[in-house]
Amino acid sequence: MRVEEFLKEKNINIGDFIRVIKEEDGEEVIYEGYVMPPYELSPGDTLVLKLENGYNIGIALSKIRRVEVIERAKVKPEIHFEAFIEGKPHLPDVTIIGTGGTIASRIDYETGAVYPAFTAEELAKAVPEIFEIANIKPKLLFNIFSEDMKPKHWIKIAHEVAKSLNSGDSGVVVAHGTDTMGYTAAALSFMLRDLGKPVILVGAQRSSDRPSSDAAMNLICSVRMSTSDVAEVMVVMHGETGDTYCLAHRGTKVRKMHTSRRDAFRSINDVPIAKVWPNGKIEFLRDDYRRRSDSEVWVDDKLEEKVALVKVYPGISSEIIEFFIDKGYRGIVIEGTGLGHTPNDIIPSIQRATEEGIAVCMTSQCIYGRVNLNVYATGRRLLKAGVIPCEDMLPETAYVKLMWVLGHTQDLEEVRRMMLTNYAGEITPYTRFDTYLR
C-alpha cells in the first residue's frame, strides 16, 4: 500500500496531528506528530511525521499497528507584515540577493518541499528582526544548489552586487548554499574592484524548518555586518555551536571545515575580521580591513574557465596532467603534499605543461601553513619545471584567482607576478602561529 492510499483509508489529511503506534522489536512504540506530504524521493510506503521537536521521522506502513487523529489540520489566516516591510527613512538600504540554499525558507505542506522565502513578506515572516536593522530589498537572482554554481553564476552575482551598491545601498547580502560558498566569496573578492561597501555571503548549515537551524541568526548578523565600516567581501556564519555570535571572515581566507556543524566556517592562516552579535555589537579582531568609502565599484569579470584543480595522492598518474594539457587547459592548480610536493614521476608532465604555456600553481593540501619549494629536492625540481608556489593561499582561492589572472594575461611571467600579488588579502605576509585550528 502506498502512503496516499493509507491516508485516504484512515481519513487522515496532510497537516493533521496524529498518534502512530508502531511495532519495533516486538514492542509498541508511540510517535506523535504532524502528517507531512510524501517527498519527491521518499519511498512510497513510508509515512512522514514532523515531531513536536521539529525533526521529521519516516515510519514504514508495514510497521504501523494503528493510528489516531489527535487534532485536525487548521488553516491559518494569512498575516500581513506591511509594518515591517514599509521603508524607514532613518535606516540604511540593504539588498539581499538570493542564489539558493536554505538561509530563509518556508515549508510547502502541499509538496513537503522547503522553498526559499524571498519576497519581502516571506522574509518578514521568517526573520522579522532584519527589518528593524535596515530597509530590506530582496531579489531572487536564481535558485540553485551551490554544487551547481559555475563561473557564469559568479559573474552574474558580481554584476547584481555592483548594481545594488552603485544605486545607493549601504551594503549587500548574498544568500548562498554553504558547500561552495568559499569559491564564490573568492571570486567576488577578485572581481569587485574599488569596493567601497560591505558584501556579505551568508548561508545556513541547517534549514529553517529544523529547531537547531542557524539560518535566522546568520541572516541577522549578516545584515548587521552589511551596514558596518568594512568594505570587503566577507562570509558571515556562526562563530561557535551555540547562538552567541557570528564571525565575519575575509572572502579569500575562509573555508567550510565541517559537513554539518553550525560553526563549520573558519578563517585559514588568518584571523577573522570581526565577531558579530545579533544585538548589533561588533568586536573587530583586526584593523587592517578596507574601510567604507564613496568609490564606485566596477566588475572585472574576465575569467579563463579552462583551469583545473588537481589533488596529489599516492599513485597519481602523469596521465592526469597530460589529459589537461591535451584538452587545451590554460592553467592547473595542484594541491600538493606537505610543503607543496608531487611524486617525482609526474614532474616531466608538469614541465611539459609549462613549456606549452600552461600555468601550473602549487598549493598545499595541508590547508594550514605555507608552500615552500626551496626546502626539499622535489620542491626545487618543481620550481625548475616552472611551477608557481602560491604562498599560503587556499587551494580553492588559488583556483579562482588563476582563472581571474588568466582572464587578463596568458604570459607566464605576468601570470607569476599576478599570482604572487596580494589583491584581496589572499596572501598573508608572514605565517601566523595563532591561527592554527582556531
From Swiss-Prot:
E.C. designation(s): 6.3.5.-
One Pfam family recorded for the sequence: Asparaginase
Keyword Magnesium on entry: no
Oxidoreductase among keywords: no
Active site feature: T102, T178, D179, K256
Keywords carried by this UniProt record: ATP-binding, Ligase, Nucleotide-binding, Protein biosynthesis
InterPro entries: AsnA_fam (IPR006033), Asp/glu_Ase-like_sf (IPR036152), Asparaginase/glutaminase-like (IPR006034), Asparaginase/glutaminase_AS1 (IPR020827), Asparaginase/glutaminase_AS2 (IPR027475), Asparaginase_C (IPR040919), GatD (IPR011878), GatD_N (IPR040918)
Single GO molecular function: glutaminyl-tRNA synthase (glutamine-hydrolyzing) activity
Asparaginase/glutaminase domain location: 92-422
SMART domains: Asparaginase
SUBUNIT field: Heterodimer of GatD and GatE.
Recorded family membership: Belongs to the asparaginase 1 family. GatD subfamily.
HAMAP family tied to this protein: GatD
Name of the molecule in the record: Glutamyl-tRNA(Gln) amidotransferase subunit D
Organism: Pyrococcus horikoshii (strain ATCC 700860 / DSM 12428 / JCM 9974 / NBRC 100139 / OT-3)
